[in-house]
Amino acid sequence: MAPSQLPPIFNPTPQDIEMLLAAQCHLGSKNLQVHMEPYLWKTRPDGVNVINIGKTWEKILLAARIIAAIENPADICVISARPYGQRAVLKFASHTGATAIAGRFTPGNFTNYITRSFKEPRLIIVTDPRTDAQAIKEASYVNIPVIALCDTDSPTEFVDVAIPTNNKGRHAIGLIWWLLAREVLRLRGTLATRETEWDVVVDLYFYRDPEAEENKEIADEAKVPGAEEIGAGAVESGFAGENWDTQAPGAGVPGTAFSAATAAPTSWEADGGDWAASSAAPAGESWAETQPAEAKW
């Protein structure tokens, strides 16, 4: 890391440097574009170009100052056709108030005023100059400044501010957008001091594969054992080992009244009496006397 020309207050913390290295923001490609040579630190024996992350940090601060100088945040357009950067630009837009274009860039967005999606931004920020070439080309037609995340092999034509970084890894892209958003909020005063921690974690800016998330949920559901896995015999033995009649009778336990009633079977011949005798009318008593008097309406 080269000596920084920034004031001491803007120097990165050790945690920031560790995050940049852990996300592999310093690993470029094996090709080198001539305009990206000033940001090169060294070339590894395997041919991979290593980016100077000190220059990366300086360009993040420069880009944040440009973004914070625009009064209306909606006049800033953040673009990413690369899938790894689409979640990051949407999160950046939600935290800073910018306008996000995630996915395919419709030709004519900046030049054809007849289209419904026509926009007139004051600044655009792109994730990759190669995949977002259409947006950069149209911005050059209407004099819109361009900030871009550039790898060592990225074309820098019509790019005004290049942030040297690895723009192909999902962690590197998400981290750069997160650092840029945090720095913009610091300059705007949303974060009181530079020592104030931002409560938004960097993981929210990382790309997540929908299919992988769905497969993970299916795998978690498959971990719950069913009757097919533990066997029908184990289920039956589990039920057989329990005594269902040992529960104390209680009002709140369903089935206790039924268990008590069926515990001792009733013998219908226990009395040994005559059913006809029990249903016969008492001696000296007439049916007419026992019938109730008719009501008179």
UniProtKB/Swiss-Prot annotation:
It comes from Aspergillus fumigatus (strain ATCC MYA-4609 / CBS 101355 / FGSC A1100 / Af293) (Neosartorya fumigata). One of its GO terms (biological process) is cytoplasmic translation. InterPro entries: Ribosomal_uS2 (IPR001865), Ribosomal_uS2_C (IPR032281), Ribosomal_uS2_CS (IPR018130), Ribosomal_uS2_euk (IPR027498), Ribosomal_uS2_euk/arc (IPR005707), Ribosomal_uS2_flav_dom_sf (IPR023591). This is Small ribosomal subunit protein uS2. Residues 252-297 are annotated as: Disordered. The lineage of its organism: Eukaryota, Fungi, Dikarya, Ascomycota, Pezizomycotina. Gene3D superfamilies: Glucose-6-phosphate isomerase like protein, domain 1 (3.40.50.10490). Required for the assembly and/or stability of the 40S ribosomal subunit. Required for the processing of the 20S rRNA-precursor to mature 18S rRNA in a late step of the maturation of 40S ribosomal subunits. Component of the small ribosomal subunit. Mature ribosomes consist of a small (40S) and a large (60S) subunit. The 40S subunit contains about 33 different proteins and 1 molecule of RNA (18S). The 60S subunit contains about 49 different proteins and 3 molecules of RNA (25S, 5.8S and 5S). Interacts with rps21.
